[in-house]
Design a protein with these regions (language model features):
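Aromatic- and histidine-enriched alpha-helix N-cap/loop-to-helix transition segments
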Residues: 40-43, 47, 105
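Short, contiguous strand/loop micro-motifs
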Residues: 13, 42, 92-94
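Histidine- and aromatic-rich ligand-binding microenvironments
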Residues: 4-5, 37-38, 98-100, 121, ...
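A generic structural signal for short hydrophobic patches within well-formed alpha-helices
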Residues: 9-10, 42-45, 74, 125
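Short, well-structured N-terminal submotif of metal-dependent ribonuclease cores
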Residues: 1-37, 46-64, 129
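Short, hinge-like loop/turn segments at secondary-structure boundaries
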Residues: 52-56, 84-86, 135-138
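Active-site neighborhoods of divalent-metal-dependent phosphate/nucleic-acid chemistry enzymes
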Residues: 65-116, 120-122
Length: 141
């Protein structure tokens, strides 16, 4: 089972090079097994694009299932965000910078409940979720 990040779901809903790359990555993942989104991705995409209940139909048509975040994943996400903030402070950067809880929840869900994550944010997920298989949709240039 592989999870899909919010950025890739948004790409799937588009009509450009990124959409084509996301569709290709999704097709390859579906050939290997179930593909899921967690509750965080559903809420992020729903809030950002306002799809509401139509979003569920869109996911089902694409072959993407729903997988809620388990308690152990939520705990790991909190631990990873704490480490992230400590690292920023140690490096002299603002600890409230950039990464919010949803990023860590998505990563922890993929690491502990799935076998990988399809995302455009390769660097962050490889850095903070060691051992997580990261699949990056590639556009044809």
């Amino acid at each position: 089972m592989i999870s899909v990040d919010s950025s890739v779901v948004v790409d799937l809903l588009g009509n450009d090079e990124r959409a084509d790359a996301a569709e290709d990555a999704l097709r390859r993942a579906l050939a290997l097994g179930p593909v899921v989104v967690c509750d965080i991705v559903v809420s992020e995409v729903g809030a950002g694009l306002g799809y509401g209940s139509n979003f569920v139909d869109t996911l089902e048509e694409a072959g993407i299932r729903y997988s809620p975040t388990e308690l152990r994943s939520a705990i790991r996400a909190g631990e990873m965000q704490r480490r992230y903030k400590q690292r920023l402070t140690t490096d002299g950067r603002n600890p409230s910078a950039r990464r919010s809880v949803p990023d860590f929840l998505i990563g922890a869900h993929a690491l502990l409940q799935c076998n990988g994550l399809i995302t455009r944010d390769e660097g962050f997920f490889r850095d903070y979720f060691k051992g997580l298989r990261v699949v990056v949709p590639r556009t044809a240039h």
